[in-house]
Amino acid sequence: MAEDLVFELGADRSLLLVDDDEPFLKRLAKAMEKRGFVLETAQSVAEGKAIAQARPPAYAVVDLRLEDGNGLDVVEVLRERRPDCRIVVLTGYGAIATAVAAVKIGATDYLSKPADANEVTHALLAKGESLPPPPENPMSADRVRWEHIQRIYEMCDRNVSETARRLNMHRRTLQRILAKRSPR
């Protein structure tokens, strides 16, 4: 199994992991090293961009939300410096809009956290021609509406009044929706 994986990886097995969740980063780094990757890690957008500029890797796994900015900034630098880099974007916020944005900028795939090393490896090595199977449970209209509200809310820097204006709804209505669906 390990020999087959190294063969699939090719000559350049360099992998950049960018995530600000240190325990997750360490676990994933250890697991990916066992799978034959040669690792570099970064915990911020600035670190990730610096490594991408200096030593663009063959593979990259980038968290979407980092403390100092957006992981898509790292994806852009990786794409510029090494167009053949296979990039997987990870996020704890699985939304269609962010997945589309990540793929448009140049990500090869998009996974929701928590993703294990097998899922990440499969996404990094998957051939582009194979289409993923259709989802077993398609999103409901309520879920689509909620994700749209969340996307606009984040776009407005979590400003309820501005979000309500953009969504063409009363501020109190939006507050009730957010309160009802927020994690407790």
Swiss-Prot record:
The keyword DNA-binding applies. It comes from the Bacteria. Phosphorylated by RegB. Residues 14-128 form the Response regulatory domain. GO terms for molecular function: DNA binding. CDD domains: REC_RegA-like. GO terms for biological process: phosphorelay signal transduction system. InterPro entries: ActR_PrrA_rreg, Bact_response_regulator, CheY-like_superfamily, Sig_transdc_resp-reg_receiver. Keywords: Activator, DNA-binding, Phosphoprotein, Transcription, Transcription regulation, Two-component regulatory system. Pfam families: Response_reg. Member of the two-component regulatory system RegB/RegA. Involved in transactivating anaerobic expression of the photosynthetic apparatus. It is a transcriptional regulator that is responsible for activating expression of the puf, puh, and puc operons in response to a decrease in oxygen tension. This is Photosynthetic apparatus regulatory protein RegA. It comes from Cereibacter sphaeroides (strain ATCC 17023 / DSM 158 / JCM 6121 / CCUG 31486 / LMG 2827 / NBRC 12203 / NCIMB 8253 / ATH 2.4.1.) (Rhodobacter sphaeroides). The gene is regA.
